[in-house]
């Protein structure tokens, strides 16, 4: 059987990006050996390193490399070295936001779960964290109050005011809702749509459209929940949730809360998709310049981002599951990097990558 070859644009970026990306490469190498898949990988500069080498955070050559690929595996960008630059020229705002805009990445997927054996890291009460949870936040990325017009400031003195506008179109709600329901079909078949329909006109439309989309998914249960209640329920009993469907601003809040209650930010992957299932896959955490180059960073988020890439952009579900199973096996065996090991011996970044790749090869 001939191997199917996928073209991947690899953008390691700054800080810990290159060293955790190296571990993702090891895991993809193992996947090539175990499954009938090959990866053609091309590396490109992005963020601070691109500023140093090309004079801007997102060179034209990097954009072209991404355009010619099936998916983008992204590391992390930013660091103190570039903080003096104007905001739009800094690595974060000058690279990630233009990439999202260029590829019309309207959907952000943020999985959050407590892995077996890591319940103690959650800030939640033990009886809650021990029940575990496995949530995917599906966040609309390009609409809502962050981008709505008009926005601005005017006036002075006591009459000075500032304003933003929350706008959602029917088509924007429909397409994000469909992704949430499709995701739920692969999971526990429950969608929780988060809104503020008791106050906001945009949320009333959101709820109406989500209910219409739900009719096409009779096998999936739809639940509506107000944003204020949802933030409380995540603390009280996160195990009740499966897929959480959110607008841009509500998804921003909910996905960060989900990340915090896992207790291990270095474990959380993220995906941003467009309507063609082309995606950018990255760890949810930052570039951690304080630990860069020390071989102690946790590579799991980068490795799990590669699993999401296999699932959502490449349609290789079996390969995605084999990565996730290998990660779970390593963690439940107590093989942990310094951020999680506590007073036990810790694995280095590279040793963790080796271990997960080994579990894939031996599965």
Swiss-Prot record:
| This protein's pathway | Amino-acid biosynthesis; L-leucine biosynthesis; L-leucine from 3-methyl-2-oxobutanoate: step 3/4
Q: Which residues bind Mg(2+)?
A: 228, 252, 256
Query: Can you tell me which residues bind substrate?
Result: 100, 110, 139, 228
A molecular function (GO) term: magnesium ion binding
Q: Where is this site: Important for catalysis?
A: 146, 196
Cite the binding residues for NAD(+): 79-92, 286-298
This protein's GO CC annotations: cytosol
How does the cofactor attach, per the note? Answer: Binds 1 Mg(2+) or Mn(2+) ion per subunit.
List locations, semicolon-separated: Cytoplasm
- Cofactors, names only: Mg(2+); Mn(2+)
Q: What is its EC number?
A: 1.1.1.85
Q: Its catalytic activity? A: (2R,3S)-3-isopropylmalate + NAD(+) = 4-methyl-2-oxopentanoate + CO2 + NADH
Which keywords has UniProt assigned to this entry? Answer: Amino-acid biosynthesis, Branched-chain amino acid biosynthesis, Cytoplasm, Leucine biosynthesis, Magnesium, Manganese, Metal-binding, NAD, Oxidoreductase
Source organism, top-level taxon: Bacteria
Subunit organization: Homodimer.
HAMAP family named among the record's database cross-references: LeuB_type1
Q: What does this protein do?
A: Catalyzes the oxidation of 3-carboxy-2-hydroxy-4-methylpentanoate (3-isopropylmalate) to 3-carboxy-4-methyl-2-oxopentanoate. The product decarboxylates to 4-methyl-2 oxopentanoate.
Recorded hits in PANTHER family, A to Z, give: 3-ISOPROPYLMALATE DEHYDROGENASE
Q: Into which family does the record put it?
A: Belongs to the isocitrate and isopropylmalate dehydrogenases family. LeuB type 1 subfamily.
Official protein name in the record: 3-isopropylmalate dehydrogenase
> From what organism does this protein derive?
Aliivibrio fischeri (strain ATCC 700601 / ES114) (Vibrio fischeri)
Gene encoding this polypeptide?
A: leuB
């Amino acid at each position: 059987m001939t191997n199917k070859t996928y073209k991947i644009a690899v953008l390691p970026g700054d800080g810990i990006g290159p060293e955790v990306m190296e571990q993702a490469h090891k895991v993809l190498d193992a996947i090539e050996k175990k499954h009938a898949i090959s990866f053609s990988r091309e590396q490109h500069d992005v963020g601070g390193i691109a500023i140093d080498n090309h004079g801007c955070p997102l060179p034209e050559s990097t954009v072209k490399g991404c355009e010619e690929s099936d998916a983008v595996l992204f590391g992390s960008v930013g660091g103190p070295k570039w903080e003096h630059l104007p905001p739009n020229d800094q690595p974060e705002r000058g690279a990630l936001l233009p990439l999202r805009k260029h590829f019309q990445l309207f959907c952000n997927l943020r999985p959050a779960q407590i892995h077996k054996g890591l319940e103690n890291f959650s800030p939640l009460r033990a009886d809650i964290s021990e029940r575990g949870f496995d949530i995917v936040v599906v966040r609309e990325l390009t609409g809502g109050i962050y981008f709505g017009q008009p926005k601005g400031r005017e006036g002075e003195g006591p009459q000075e005011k500032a304003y933003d506008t929350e706008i959602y179109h029917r088509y924007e709600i429909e397409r994000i809702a469909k992704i949430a329901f499709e995701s739920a079909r692969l999971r526990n078949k429950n969608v929780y749509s988060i809104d503020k329909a008791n106050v906001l006109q945009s949320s009333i439309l959101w709820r109406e459209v989500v209910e219409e989309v739900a009719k096409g998914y009779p096998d999936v249960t739809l639940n509506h929940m107000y944003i204020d209640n949802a933030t409380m329920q995540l603390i009280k009993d996160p195990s009740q949730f499966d897929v959480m469907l959110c607008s841009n601003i509500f998804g921003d809040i909910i996905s960060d809360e989900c990340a915090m209650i896992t207790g291990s930010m270095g474990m959380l992957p993220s995906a941003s998709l467009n309507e063609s299932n082309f995606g950018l896959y990255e760890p949810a955490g930052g570039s951690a310049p304080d630990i860069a180059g020390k071989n102690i960073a946790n590579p799991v988020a980068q490795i799990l981002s590669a699993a999401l890439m296999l699932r959502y952009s490449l349609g290789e579900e079996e390969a995605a599951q084999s990565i996730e199973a290998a990660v779970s096996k390593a963690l439940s065996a107590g093989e942990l990097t310094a951020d999680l090991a506590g007073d036990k011996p810790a694995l280095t970044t590279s040793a963790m990558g080796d271990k997960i790749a080994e579990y894939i090869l031996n599965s």
